[in-house]
A protein has these predicted regions:
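C-terminal catalytic lobe of pepsin-like aspartyl proteases
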Residues: 1-181
Length: 181
């Protein structure tokens, strides 16, 4: 369910209609792929990802295929949670598994807002299953809180062909129906 192909080296050339390419940002330690996330947009509400300095910090998030959730600092997560709550028009319910902070009752008529990851260089529109997960009787925002490990997780990357090009120093996302590959 959480799988998506990642490509490196000669196979990292991810091209085609809808391909989104953003610059990698060299940071220490060098074992992670850092990019600059400028904001998340919930419908038309742009929520900037500013750091302690009040500006967007270079290389402020890593692309992580090993972690399911996208993890964000509490102050940024709280703003996204508020925007999603205001746009959803549904009552919150507790997460039956205590994994998520924002959940709504699972319902076919539940209207969830569109969410876009605004990276420096391009925007990645998330599908419903990239931003929300349904567990049992609840549908929850698939973002978590962390002050120390800020990551764009595998749920957000699901059904994207992801290519890391170390020569061009970029990462590309191409919408791809992995379940039909």
């Amino acid at each position: 369910m959480f799988s998506h192909p990642s490509n490196f080296g000669d196979r990292a050339a991810v091209r085609g209609p809808g391909t989104i390419t953003v610059a990698l940002v060299p940071r220490q330690p060098g074992s992670f792929y850092h990019v600059t996330l400028e904001a998340f947009t919930v419908i038309r509400t742009r929520i900037p990802f500013t750091g302690r300095s009040g500006t967007v910090e270079q290389g402020n998030i890593i692309i992580d295929s090993g972690m399911a959730l996208t993890t964000l600092p509490r102050h940024f997560y709280a703003q996204i949670k508020q925007a999603v709550t205001m746009q959803t028009h549904a009552s919150e319910v507790p997460d039956p598994y205590r994994l998520f902070e924002l959940c709504f009752r699972k319902d076919r008529s539940l209207q969830l807002p569109s969410i876009v990851a605004n990276f420096r260089g391009d925007n990645v529109p998330l599908k419903r299953f990239n931003a929300f997960v349904t567990w049992g009787s609840a549908t929850c925002l698939a973002f978590g809180v962390s002050e120390s490990f800020i990551a764009y997780g595998s749920l957000a990357q699901q059904d994207f062909l992801v290519g890391f090009d170390q020569y061009a120093i970029t990462v590309s996302f191409n919408p791809f129906r992995c379940s039909h590959a």
